[in-house]
């Protein structure tokens, strides 16, 4: 019988059997005098009991004493152990487990994890890097980055793939996790309620918890829709507000940029489903392939014989055989200075840029543009790029730190453009198009 697999990502710990997910639970714990609330129930009371709530015991897996004394747990390792016991029970008590873990885990944390498992009623038979396992299921030869988001940070894993998938580097972006995304959303939504219904949901713990409980639904809705209706009940009163997609993307822009700016331009991106579920993020990357939640488990199932080992000191696997039937292939990438476009040898000179159905003429004097706002003044601190036209043709120059894209490829400072090319921005669905206007 195939082993069960536990993916340790505290934004949603997942358990799979034979490649199919059977359990999902977040890495939250609320300490009570005589019990510990874990998982989703703990997450849904985190803002009701903030001092008793813990959500960093997986990311900071250690034996340092908890800040709040409790007879139920002494340190983060105790909380992790208690959650593993609960997961084992909820997942029909598997005898053997393979763990997939993020590249952010240190040797000491991996050793501590295996020590914790020795006190659990199951046996750990494998330990593998989550990014490596996911890529081994789908990716063909090339250079990739695997990007995944946890509760409090994002992990970018560099992978080289030939006959094998090999981890070559790990970059951790702190303070850029699901909780940071939700905190940003909560602040924006609270402001909207104050503006639209004179109600502040963050003034009381119960309504603040209700706000946070609904944020995942709001984000899913805005993946495909331009707006979402917000509602929070307080007593017998139903408070409502409306959230539009574009202001949300602007609010999340700084979080998105932390990740985008850390991605090497020459790499193909393998994007976890957690990031794919954030509105506008997938459009921020020029060469990206979304991964399903099951992908990492399929990689483990395909390579279980390689991953499995015996004894208390398991080998941490950071290289696996590459799939012979890849669903993802690296794509030829144009240099940032000259993004690829179709029929570039026949492309007409761009004379105008089409913004919100209005054509703006290009000339020697730069035209300054901002995502979602269109043409702005040269002195506008929020300008994102400038466009100008010379004898050599039209070109786009980045202004400020926001990543700018031409035809889906991020530019490096400046790039030429022709009629038919598109202009985009990190963290925004805004797309402007260059056109050639014929004069007679």
For the regions a language model picked out, list residue spans one by one.
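Forkhead-associated
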Residues: 351-440
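Phosphate-binding glycine-rich/basic clefts of nucleotide- and phosphate-handling proteins
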Residues: 160-243, 273-276
């Amino acid at each position: 019988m195939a082993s069960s697999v536990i993916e340790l990502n505290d934004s949603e710990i997942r358990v799979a059997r034979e490649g199919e997910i059977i359990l999902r639970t977040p890495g939250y714990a609320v300490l009570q005098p005589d019990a510990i609330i874990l998982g989703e129930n703990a997450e849904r009371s985190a803002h009701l009991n903030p001092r008793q709530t813990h959500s960093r015991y997986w990311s900071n897996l250690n034996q340092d004493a908890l800040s709040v004394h409790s007879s139920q747990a002494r340190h983060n390792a105790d909380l992790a152990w208690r959650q593993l016991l609960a997961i084992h029970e909820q997942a029909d008590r598997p005898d053997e487990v393979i763990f997939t873990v993020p590249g952010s885990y240190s040797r000491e944390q991996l050793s501590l994890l295996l020590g914790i498992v020795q006190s659990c009623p199951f046996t750990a038979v494998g330990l593998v890097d989550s990014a490596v396992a996911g890529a081994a299921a789908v990716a063909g030869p090339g250079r990739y980055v695997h990007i995944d988001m946890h509760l409090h940070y994002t992990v970018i894993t560099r992978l080289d793939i030939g006959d094998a998938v090999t981890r070559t580097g790990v970059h951790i972006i702190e303070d850029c996790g699901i909780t940071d995304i939700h905190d940003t959303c909560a602040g924006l939504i609270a402001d909207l309620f104050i503006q639209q219904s004179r109600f502040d949901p963050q003034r009381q713990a119960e309504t603040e918890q209700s706000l946070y409980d609904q944020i995942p639904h709001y984000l899913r809705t805005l993946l495909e829709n331009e707006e979402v209706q917000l509602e929070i009940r307080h007593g017998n009163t139903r408070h409502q507000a409306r959230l539009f997609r574009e202001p949300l993307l602007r609010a999340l822009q700084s979080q998105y940029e932390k990740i985008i700016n850390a991605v090497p331009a020459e790499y193909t991106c393998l994007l976890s489903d957690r990031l794919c579920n954030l509105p506008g993020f997938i459009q921020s990357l020029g060469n990206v392939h979304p991964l399903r939640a099951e992908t990492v488990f399929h990689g483990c199932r395909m390579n279980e014989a390689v991953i499995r080992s015996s004894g208390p000191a398991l080998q941490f696997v950071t290289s696996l055989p590459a799939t012979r039937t890849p669903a993802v292939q690296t794509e030829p990438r144009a240099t940032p200075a000259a993004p690829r476009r179709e029929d570039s040898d026949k492309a007409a000179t761009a004379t105008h840029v089409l913004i919100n159905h209005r054509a703006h003429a290009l000339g020697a004097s730069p035209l300054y543009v901002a995502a979602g706002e269109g043409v702005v003044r040269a002195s506008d601190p929020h300008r994102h790029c400038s466009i100008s036209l010379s004898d050599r043709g039209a070109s786009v120059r980045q202004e400020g730190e926001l990543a700018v894209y031409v035809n889906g490829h991020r530019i490096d400072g400046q790039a030429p453009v022709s009629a038919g090319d598109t202009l985009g921005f990190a963290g925004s669905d805004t797309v402007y198009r260059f056109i050639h206007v014929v004069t007679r």
